[in-house]
């Protein structure tokens, strides 16, 4: 790396004095970056050679960030091939997907995205409050998602490179595979909704998380519900949906 840095002044080599963990290390990287844009690339993943060029050409003043179609690849071949239907998704379309069912399969990891350096420095969250004793600074789960969520609020849409520009490697040593990270991400969503969104979004997420608890039949989300202070009032139509789900769950358990 030092050899490359000696050939091009734009390449910077930086080493922390101690091991500060992934999240604080990301923050140091963002602060040391001097370019207009940042492309994050984790050690397990790779990108197409022309990804940055194409992403920079696509981003505009109304775009929060640029992501591409991406593949998840294992030693046995392609695990998932995510292709997006449109070149642009509105802020509302993006938020409803990423916060709720995520039918479009928007990524949690920023490894397939191009961001403005200023946006990353202005919106990066280091500590995610929770009552489950989770420390996301140790793994970055939730901190990565909040990059997308916080930035998109300031723009009209996200932009999509409709080609396979990013590749995530899935293997048994992968941190995201070895660890159960779902609860970290749900706390990140709750933090974002409580801090940033209006009552409509806030109400919807409470209903959906309440439904998740019933449907999954476990108490993993208990502290989340306490945090949300669910008031047990719901529209009749949603109550009927939940009742139907409960009945189906009971039938399936017989």
Label each region the model flagged.
Residues 1-3, 46, 50:
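Acidic helix N-cap motif at the loop->helix transition within catalytic regions
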Residues 1-18:
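Acidic donor-binding segment of Leloir-type glycosyltransferases
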Residues 91-178:
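Conserved nucleotide-sugar donor-binding catalytic segment
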Residues 38:
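Short aromatic/hydrophobic "clamp" motif used to bind/position activated sugar donors
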Residues 42-46, 69:
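The conserved acidic donor/metal-binding loop of glycosyltransferases
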Residues 196-197, 203-254:
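Membrane-interface aromatic/basic loop that binds lipid-linked glycans or pyrophosphate carriers
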Residues 50-83:
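Conserved donor NDP-sugar-binding/catalytic core segment of glycosyltransferases
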Residues 16-33, 46:
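Glycine-rich, basic loop-to-helix element that forms the pyrophosphate-binding segment
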């Amino acid at each position: 790396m030092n050899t490359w840095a000696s050939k091009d002044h734009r390449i910077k080599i930086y080493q922390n004095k101690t091991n500060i963990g992934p999240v604080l290390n990301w923050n140091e990287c963002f602060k040391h970056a001097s370019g207009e844009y940042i492309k994050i690339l984790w050690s397990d993943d790779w990108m197409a050679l022309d990804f940055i060029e194409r992403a920079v050409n696509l981003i505009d003043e109304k775009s929060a960030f640029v992501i591409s179609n991406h593949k998840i690849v294992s030693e046995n071949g392609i695990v998932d091939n995510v292709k997006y239907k449109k070149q642009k998704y509105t802020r509302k379309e993006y938020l409803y997907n990423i916060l709720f069912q995520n039918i479009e399969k928007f990524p949690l990891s920023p490894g397939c995205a191009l961001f403005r350096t200023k946006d990353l420095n202005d919106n990066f969250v280091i500590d995610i409050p929770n009552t489950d004793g989770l420390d996301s600074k140790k793994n970055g789960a939730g901190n990565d998602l909040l990059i997308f969520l916080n930035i998109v609020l300031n723009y009209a849409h996200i932009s999509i490179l409709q080609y396979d520009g990013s590749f995530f490697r899935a293997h048994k040593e992968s941190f995201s595979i070895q660890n159960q990270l779902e609860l970290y991400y749900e706390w990140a969503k709750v933090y974002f909704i409580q801090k940033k969104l209006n009552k409509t979004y806030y109400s919807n997420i409470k209903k959906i998380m309440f439904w998740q608890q019933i449907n999954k039949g476990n108490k993993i989300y208990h502290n989340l519900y306490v945090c949300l202070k669910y008031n047990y009032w719901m529209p009749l139509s949603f109550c009927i949906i939940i009742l139907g789900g409960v009945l189906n769950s009971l039938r399936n358990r017989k």
